[in-house]
Amino acid sequence: MSRATALLLVIVIGAVAAFAWTRWTSDEAAVERRLHGLAAEVNESTIDGAGLRARSAQLGTYFTDDVVIDLGKGAAAIRGRATVMDMASRLQPRTSAFTLQLTDIGVVLAPDRLSGSVVLTAEFTRRGGGENAIDARELSLAVTKADGAWRISRLTVVEAFK
């Protein structure tokens, strides 16, 4: 291998490593990792009372105090982290038959890099009964960064074409 080829190889490897490092450590990647963490928490299951309270508290860390969840179709908006946590603790035993996977995540941050918007597809798969059933929904999220963590401040179900 000639010296020029070796130098070119080192430059290419360095550029790829720099790109990968920048991508992994970017705020956009941090938002994506945080959302995948939320999905992993949702997919965990527990059945005892203390475990349900602990899980709902952990799920609450992914939302701002004043989060608004708009499910559309005339449903009343869900307001506040405390409400989300209460609902999560009561629904957990019934949601254990489902898994959540987030795909097609697109993150756009505001110039201040402390807020942004996310569009993604949430795929809910019902396990058991012989055949899995999948329900996919497009979601639009507003996210904010506080105390070093990205949290959801608004979640809206995007209506599909009719």
Model segments located where?
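Short beta-strand edge/turn micro-motifs at domain boundaries
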Residues: 2-5, 24, 115-117, 131-162
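Hydrophobic membrane-insertion alpha-helices, especially the h-region
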Residues: 5-21
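Ser/Thr/Pro/Gly-rich low-complexity linker/stalk segments immediately outside membranes or between
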Residues: 23-39
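Short, well-ordered alpha-helical segments enriched in acidic and aromatic residues
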Residues: 34, 47-72
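A solvent-exposed, acidic/Ser-Thr-rich amphipathic alpha-helical stretch
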Residues: 65-106
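Short, cysteine-centered beta-strand-loop-beta hairpins and adjacent loop/turn segments enriched
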Residues: 93-97, 123-135
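A short hydrophobic beta-strand element
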Residues: 112-124
